[in-house]
Amino acid sequence: MSAELKQKLMFLGICLAAVSLLYGRTLAGDFVFDDRGIVEHQALLSNLNQLDKMLTLPYWTEEAGLYRPITLASYTFNYLLFGSGPAGFHFVNLLLHALTGFLIYLLVDKLFKRRLLAYLTALIFLLLPIHSEAVANIIGRAEILALLFSLLAFLSLLKEPQPNQGGLNLKNYWPAGVWLFLAIGSKETAIAALPIAAVMIYAKEKIFWSRENFYKYLPAAAWSAAGLAAYFGLRFLVLGGEYFLKSVTSMVENPLQFVSAGPRIITALNILALYFKKSFWPLGLCSDYSYNQLPVLHNFFNAGTLIGLAVLSLAVVGVFLVRRAPIISLAAAIFLFGFLPTANLFFPTGTIMGERLAYFPSLGFSLLLAYGLNEIFKFRGKIMAKYLAVGLFAALAVFYGAVSFLRAGDWLTEKRLFASAAGCAPLSVLSRSNLGASYYLAGDLVNAKKELLAAREIYDGYPKGINNLGLVYWKEGDLKTARELFLKALSFKFPYYGAYENLALISLEEGKVKEARLWLMLLYSGDKATADNYVEAYLNAE
């Protein structure tokens, strides 16, 4: 084994150890929050024979405008390798996060030939607490896979071309297209890999255009185009024209879908400043920013928006420093292009803000921070500069590591997560409603009702929260109010269909079997046999 290979394997071990130390406790965690989608689709995801069907399925719902077959396929392999328990899913997330850090090291080292910079970038990335949601929340795997496969595409792109009888063999460059397809098939935000790759090539070649570079990278570009065509072709077939480029969501997930461009951009810039702040100073991390935790802003001249504009402007300027400062340019490009697909600046997306969305762009932040530490460390003739750089990194490692470790604990159970979310997002209808639901499940009707009424005060349009409040009234014996709330939960554009079952159960409780069957027929899309079996099982259990 060569010394080079030993060194790489040793650093891979360091990455695995760091991730295990920070997030190992999540192996004891449950399926929480959005992870429930994995459990609800277990019959499909756990069946290897259904793998081809996943290529024709949207990511949970068609209206969301999401198509992520690679992420869905990863859940299938998870079921096959580690069973249906959450520990196996958490283990794979940890493994993928560590591998992503290792690939970051390989990329930075290959591109800039600066090993210390590569070490620092990878370690800072692994330590950043803003990644806790993407790593500890199983559903955050989409973020990890999108970056991981993008890194593999970049590494494939940077391979030295191999001549073939005086020309270039197109077959040698197929990995670039495959990795890009897998990246975008994991999450759409990996489209950012394209402009980042352009900046990367410029940083490597030190020239914007030449005939030699054109032919050098043409095969990889051709395969990348093929990968894109394959993904977008499948996306169109699955989502159709209506949702191909559009995400339809509710006011709860993203109120910016329901305002004009001006307030949307003003608010989005304020949110960009929040992302930047929480990447560097990760106190007050939160799993939820739903309505109305981040109110829509209408005044451009507020501190958050102006800071966000400054961050955006500096990132744009930084990209154009590619000739004079290629490392800064690449860091700016990753940060800028990594954020734009989810930033709500040019178009509204499916969510107003989520810390998991910082996973890809935070690589740019990590590279920039590592560059600063590296420059201090190599300051000539100043031994104190080296001590300062080491001290700063050690302080960051302890600070970021401690916050990441503590934050990972919030994701162990839904009760802990929802309590944490209600504390950091007290104005979110989703957080207050979820906390109320956790109290309800624990049998604490007083606090459940208090939280669910508080959620309704924030926004009387969240169907699941209204349904949960109906459950509380049902438990209290107020069937009239419970029935009214269940019906209200079904009256929205995005109804909560579980309310049909609750209405059926109330009817059965009152002895109205025929009425219960009607509600169940609506729940099961007219499937009379399933409705009859449900009623029969209920009556036999009495």
Question: Language-model segments: which ranges?
Answer:
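Polytopic membrane enzymes that build or remodel cell-surface glycoconjugates and lipids
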Residues: 1-475, 498, 502
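Residue-level detector of alpha-helical secondary structure
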Residues: 377, 487, 517-520, 535-539
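Conserved structural position within tetratricopeptide repeats
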Residues: 423, 453-457, 487-491, 522-525
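Boundary/linker segments of alpha-helical solenoid repeat arrays
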Residues: 429-430, 463-464, 495-499, 525-537
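TPR/TPR-like alpha-solenoid repeats
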Residues: 438, 472, 506, 523, ...
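TPR/TPR-like (Sel1-like) alpha-helical repeat modules
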Residues: 501, 505-530
